[in-house]
Structures are given as structure tokens and as C-alpha cells.
């Protein structure tokens, strides 16, 4: 079993990349998703693409680079022995240190479990902000990768992409850097991610612990109308509910079932693939939990609420 780690900070596009990868590789694989504190929102999206070729394993209560590393190692060994896929694709939480995940996997690596060259995805729009606000973590994810993919570059010019490339090269001179949209990649290019084994490069060691965002999750939620959801998201990106850098959820709004996604100061709303119980997760600092909860239908409030203050993994 070969293991490909797809790392990246909050909202960089890891799940979208994995969906694109799964549609192109034509191999038997399993996806291990570590969606810490986010109520498993992305599992269904990945599951639709992996249903025929593999399975989805979710770890939503712990970070696989720190507190949950023993469970993570156990899950990897279980997948290798019970499922025995050709490939395991690992999607860590966006606030996990890639270097520590690599260290954890190296401890259980043997002739039947091999680590492929890790991939890190960075958002071209949020690159500067996250590099400034979370430098240790952000640099760790870039420096520990074999390939760095710059996402959301469809509307970016050559100069902007080259500027980001130079920043990345300073952090990781040996990385392959891709700035063209991965939506335009050929099948052969996706298959190359499954061929290059990790060469045992230098693993970054964090000298200091870094304060990371808090996570606030809600389950069994709904909204009165789609319009109210749009107003809620607009207020969120304007800072009304604290410094929210990432949010996502799926819920019923009126008669519609919708999915929302917030990354930095941008948001999208699309139709949900399945009609499931409403879930939402918010990541950031100084989160105004009660104000957020007030936006949802009264009968849904307080049924199940989860709040976690994260420390640096």
C-alpha cells in the first residue's frame, strides 16, 4: 500500500483536489480524512467519487499529527491489513503539521507500506495572510512537501503566480511547484503523484508552539430561507461573528438543501448532494458563538453543540 498525503491550510482546496485525483487515477484506493471538529462535512462529497474505487475513513475528533497520532497509525495499519488497497490518500486537518504526520507514518513504514512524496496545496488569495498569521504551521506544510500546488489561480496573472512561486522556493527550494489550475491537468499528471516515493528529505522541526484557530461546530441545524443564509455569510466575511477564516456546512434553508463554504473573505453556496441532517463548522479567532447560533432556527438551537479550543499540534 502506497500512501499519498494531501496537505494544505484551511480552505486551500484539498478535498476538491482529491475528488479530481480520484476521478483520474483509475486505481483501487482508500481515503483517510482527518476533518477535526468539522462534523464530517466533506466525507459525503469524497464518498460519491470513491464509492466505486475505494472507501472513506473519517477521523473527526483528534488531529492525526498530535493527540490522535496513535489512532491514526492504528487506522493506517488496519486499512493496510483489512482492506489492502493499492493506495491510501490521507487528507489531514488544515491546521496539522505535515512534518509530524510524515514522522508518524515513517514509524510504521515497511515493505508493504510505502510513503509517496507529499503534496501541499496553498490558496493564492490567502497565501500572504496565513503566512503572516500562522508562519510556523504554514511554512511547515510547504517545507515538508515534495510538490506544492497553488490553487484558485484561474483568474491570476503570470506576475502574481510568479511572485507566489518565488516565495515558495525560498521556503522549499527542492519542491516541484505547480501554479496552473489542477482542473486542467491531464490524467498522466495525476498518475505521477502516485509514482514518486518520498525521498526522505529534511523534516522541519518547530522551535516554538503556535497559537492556532478555535473550532466551533453545530449539528442538526437549519435556516428559514436561502436569503437568510446569504445574509449570514455576508455578515460573516465582514467580521460580524469574529475573525472567521474558514467555515463550511450543509443544511436545509426553506425548501432547499444547500452547502456553504467560506475561505478567508470569500464564500460560495451550492446545492447539497444529499438531504442530510444540517451541520456547520466555523474556524477562527474570537468566535462569537452565541451570535452565530442565533441565526439558526429556534428548534435546532442547542440540540448538539461542540466547541473546541485548539492548541498547536
Tell where the protein language model's regions lie, with residue ranges:
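Short internal beta-strands
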Residues: 31-33, 149-152
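Charged helix-capping and loop-helix junction motifs
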Residues: 133-136
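Nucleotide-state-sensitive switch-loop elements of NTP-binding domains
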Residues: 2-7, 12-131
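C-terminal accessory "lid"/substrate-recognition subdomains
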Residues: 140-147, 155-274, 286-291, 297-313
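Flexible loop/N-cap segments at domain edges
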Residues: 282
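Short beta->alpha junction loops/turns
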Residues: 11, 69, 94-95, 153-154, ...
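Short, well-ordered beta-strand core segments
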Residues: 118, 147-149
